Amino acid sequence: MFGSIAKALFGSSNDRYVKSLDKIVRQIAAFEPHVQALSDEELAAQTPKFRQMLAEGKTLDDILPEAFATVREASVRALGMRHFDVQMIGGIVLHRGEIAEMRTGEGKTLVATLAVYLNALEGKGVHVVTVNDYLARRDAETMGVLYNFLGLTVGVIVPNLNEEQRREAYNADITYATNNELGFDYLRDNMKHERGQMVHRPFNFAIVDEVDSILIDEARTPLIISGPTDDKSDLYISVDAVVKQIAPDLYEADEKTKNITLTEDGVEWVERAFEDAGLLVGSNLYDVENTMVVHHLDQALKANVMFKRDIDYIVKDGKIVIIDEFTGRMMDGRRWSNGLHQAVEAKEGVKIEPENQTMASITFQNYFRMYPKIAGMTGTAATEAPEFFDIYKMNVVSIPTNVPVQRIDEEDEFYKNTMDKFGAIAKLIRERYENGQPVLVGTVSIEKSELLSEFLQKEGVKHNVLNARFHEMEAHIVAQAGRLGAVTIATNMAGRGTDIQLGGNVEFRIEDELRDVPEGPEREAGIARIRAEVAEEKQKVLAAGGLCVIGTERHESRRIDNQLRGRSGRQGDPGMSKFYLCLEDDLLRIFGPDTLFARMMNSNLADGEAIGSKWLSKAIETAQKKVEARNYDIRKQVVEYDDVMNDQRKVIYEQRADIMDAEAVGDVVTDMRHDTVNAIVGDACPPGSYPEQWDVESLKARVRDVLGIEIPLDDWFQEEAIEPDTIEERIQQLADAHMDTKITEVDASAWRSLEKSILLERLDHHWKEHLATLDALRQVVFLRAYAQKTPINEYKQEAFGLFEKMLDAIREDVTRILMTSEIRLRPVEEFQLPELPDFLTSHIDPFTGENDAAPLAPAPSMFGALPPQAGGALSGGFPDGDPFAGQGISRNAPCPCGSGQKYKHCHGVAA
């Protein structure tokens, strides 16, 4: 109570902060007469002038007022649009690395030009991040006119660009791209073998459009680059056949987590079924020998019970295509991980694609935290303000609207079941349709949108259905959703980023209707006609009440509901919004309290009758807050676990960069060889032990295997007081001499290139294996809680130990290959590094399978002078193909290179 009184008297902290920016807005306005008097050439010359001022020691804040005034005037001349004062406030907020919450239609795209231009003046690159390729292209084209006017270059990253095109786009002053393209390019860059092959340049400043969608909704879904493993189609099909016969009373399903647990009777039934199918080793399902088949069982249960066709995925052209739970869009090319996608393929009887092993991975949380400065824009961020600050250290600032909002938000209506609810929705839509009022209906799934479509067909209402099946036309359909009598059904927030303008979108109509009309009088007349028609139609729509937004059920997040409401009432237009709910809605069914069900079911609510209740609305809000809190906890957990991997990832990637930048890595190789010798001697001759306790034969064998040399160990033991340190020093000297002899027999330049190639390949190989090990650890570490231990602390401790073991394995691996391989090299000019294969990219929830740390030692200390990396098999590392040719090695024997693979799958491929 007292808080609300104080807020009324003094305003909120947000109001006070926005008011404090008025001084800067006035400074910007003071420069307007000056820039308005400049010619086009003089206005463009402001850019080199500002850059000179920065070179002389001025800061971006120093030149902000004049720079913003310059952009405002250039926008008037190049785009025909002038920034409002509230948009100037938004630009200042973005420049300061904060989130500007701006309502739909307030011109976020134009606001971004202010901060983008100012920060691009430093020449370090500015990334503007969008949610889809269409918006990246659109904004780069439309705003590119302004930037080019001011002498800045603009690039856009979209799929199917080659590496040279990507590099050129990243080197532009301003780069538009989707979050996925940026993340995957970063991962691919860190799998390459030469600095010149990389496309990214150092991180500087990013502005994220629809920041809540990218940094909140997709925060649980890591970007993954993976490569294929062995085919297990038969196992998936066999397990799926058994799962389809399991009765519902033999398992318990948790719809919140999408996990399935077999009952005791269920375990016994599955054991018998698996035994009959020849899938069980022994008689106990949970014996260690059955770990793999239990994993397949879990995924098959999840696929058959929890994942619904046309809700979680669709079958298109014989393939399983994931549906984005937030937008309803098809996620072509994305696959669930850990065998879930294969389990769904087996369920639907389509071709089962091989599983993939993770080669590189990163979450958006850790990707975007690499930027020294990051800002964001959205229409809905206030409800997630604590999370933005906790994880990204970004404040949310609500920017005032240029014109007061006139939209009317009506109270929710509750019905007993879906059919009653949809009947009422269809009736309201028909009334508004007959009145000419445009209607936008938001649904949560393809299934619901098609069900409502059937209702509207019976009512005789013409309408457009916008869902994952037809997302190619998404922007065009949404853009015209404000036309007279238009009825549009959209899954969730499809079409986000495209304004719904009352009367229709002039630019889209020009594009559609005048596509084939060349420049000239006829086209000019057509444009004038369209503008007049849109203006006339807008007046009719305004008279009909503006855009009517209907929600068919509440989303898990209040923010998503607010996004739907926000499509109506843009720039002071009238409008209304209303949500229809029923007991069968997912939110009420899964998360609603039992008392809600009891009171509703026991009420005398007749079929088709609706009720409105503050108690029910409060219960819905409570359920939403509960889900929001759960999802936030999941995202925080993702950050905690990924931070452990992220620390290790940064070390590995820094090591790769140092290796690629170095002209020679001989010192690194020598340090690794010496460390390997120390480890071998340390294992055989533990500190504090007596010579009688040393494992002499093991030491001989290990030296022979890893270093390829024989040592006079028996003679050394005849000496008095021989110490492990002395043995280490002597073995190092022998190994160094052996390596020096090998180096003198080959071309020096080619040898240096080979050393770098082997370092990178071994580093990449072991890093890939390490990722798989960490993933397996993460899946089971939660069980430590039963032993009264904290899972995250256990994970940190074990992950660090695994990382140290990986580094030891890399040192030994590189040493073995260089010391024991018989290598024939051509001169360096003929030496070609291997090309990066085309790996599969995916973006999958690590907890549900849905689409949706202790600091390490400094990098240079890991391997000595420089750091190491990981790589796959040595294909391409040896220009002459197989260095072991002619040695009579069996094709099924382990490859002498030490990769752990069979010879026929490694160097034997070349033979």
From Swiss-Prot:
Predominantly, its location class is membrane
Q: Where does the record place it?
A: Cell inner membrane; Cytoplasm
Annotated binding of Zn(2+), by residue: 895, 897, 906-907
* Membrane topology listed for this record: Peripheral membrane protein
Cofactor binding mode and count? May bind 1 zinc ion per subunit.
- SUPFAM superfamilies given in the database record: Helical scaffold and wing domains of SecA (SSF81886), P-loop containing nucleoside triphosphate hydrolases (SSF52540), Pre-protein crosslinking domain of SecA (SSF81767)
In the record, what terms sit under GO molecular function? ATP binding; metal ion binding; protein-exporting ATPase activity
Q: Which reaction does it catalyse?
A: ATP + H2O + cellular proteinSide 1 = ADP + phosphate + cellular proteinSide 2
The alphabetized UniProt keywords are:
ATP-binding, Cell inner membrane, Cell membrane, Cytoplasm, Membrane, Metal-binding, Nucleotide-binding, Protein transport, Translocase, Translocation, Transport, Zinc
| Cited InterPro entries | Helicase_ATP-bd, Helicase_C-like, P-loop_NTPase, SEC_C_motif, SecA, SecA_CS, SecA_DEAD, SecA_motor_DEAD
Task: Enumerate the residues binding ATP.
Answer: 87, 105-109, 499
Q: What is its EC number?
A: 7.4.2.8
Q: Which GO terms describe its cellular component?
A: cell envelope Sec protein transport complex; cytosol; plasma membrane
Cofactors: Zn(2+)
Top EC class of this enzyme = translocase
Q: Name one GO biological process term.
A: protein import
The entry's family comment says: Belongs to the SecA family.
Family matches, as NCBIfam families: PRK12904.1, secA
Write out the function statement from the record.
Part of the Sec protein translocase complex. Interacts with the SecYEG preprotein conducting channel. Has a central role in coupling the hydrolysis of ATP to the transfer of proteins into and across the cell membrane, serving both as a receptor for the preprotein-SecB complex and as an ATP-driven molecular motor driving the stepwise translocation of polypeptide chains across the membrane.
Q: How does it assemble?
A: Monomer and homodimer. Part of the essential Sec protein translocation apparatus which comprises SecA, SecYEG and auxiliary proteins SecDF-YajC and YidC.
- Recorded protein name is Protein translocase subunit SecA
This protein's species is Novosphingobium aromaticivorans (strain ATCC 700278 / DSM 12444 / CCUG 56034 / CIP 105152 / NBRC 16084 / F199)
Task: Please spell out the taxonomic lineage of the organism that makes this protein.
Answer: Bacteria, Pseudomonadati, Pseudomonadota, Alphaproteobacteria, Sphingomonadales
Q: Which gene encodes it?
A: secA
